[in-house]
Amino acid sequence: PWVYEQCQIHPGMRILELGCGDGVLWTQNISSLPGKVSVTLSDLSSGMLRDARRAIGRKDSRFSFEAFDCARIPHEDRSFDLVIANHVLFYCEDISAVCSEIQRVLTPGGKLICSTYGKKHMQEVSRLVRDFDDRIVLSADKLYERFGRENGADILAPYFSRIFWESYKDSLLVPDAEPLISYILSCHGNQNQYLLD
């Protein structure tokens, strides 16, 4: 709900979400979405779009679904009042091209809402794993170095005149080991090589 709340959606808005995944941003907030909006959900993966369409339902006329690369948005200039890139920009091969495209399709006064994380994200888990075996790396890619808390404003500055950072204040207490182990094993690093032997 936090990212959705930052969007401040009101009737009449034309919205584009880049990298919508399974549409969870919308399925979790569909009862709050005004009736007179137009939401274009996009993803590079047609499978993800299929999942989003299935989760939202085909009968909701507020939504359309399009597969495309966000470095080449197939819409006219000034088509959207709001563009959302929720944990997406750090996956983009050419972030500058994506920002240029977002700027192009936004209306004057339109907004980009994007999310990322920083260098200290989940640092306690990383430290725990390193203390167990210092060969383990939970992520082979440091995505925050591509677009993160520490450099995001500098990357966006050539394309957007006003940039604001809103921190999501949160903490997580994990009293049982099993969910933590499952999370660690699901990461994109080399942990399975050392932990599952």
Model-inferred region functions:
Residues 1-13, 28:
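Conserved alpha-helix/loop element of class I SAM-dependent methyltransferases that forms part
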Residues 16-72:
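Class I SAM-dependent methyltransferase SAM/SAH-binding core
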Residues 71-83:
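A short acidic, Gly/Pro-enriched loop at the edge of an enzyme's catalytic core
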Residues 82-95:
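A short SAM/SAH-binding and catalytic strip from SAM-dependent methyltransferases
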Residues 96-108:
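A short glycine-rich, Lys/Arg-flanked "PGG" loop and its adjoining helix->strand segment in the class I
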Residues 113-135:
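Conserved class I S-adenosyl-L-methionine
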Residues 145-159:
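Short alpha-helix
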Residues 164-197:
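C-terminal helical/coil "lid" or tail adjacent to the Rossmann-like core of SAM-dependent
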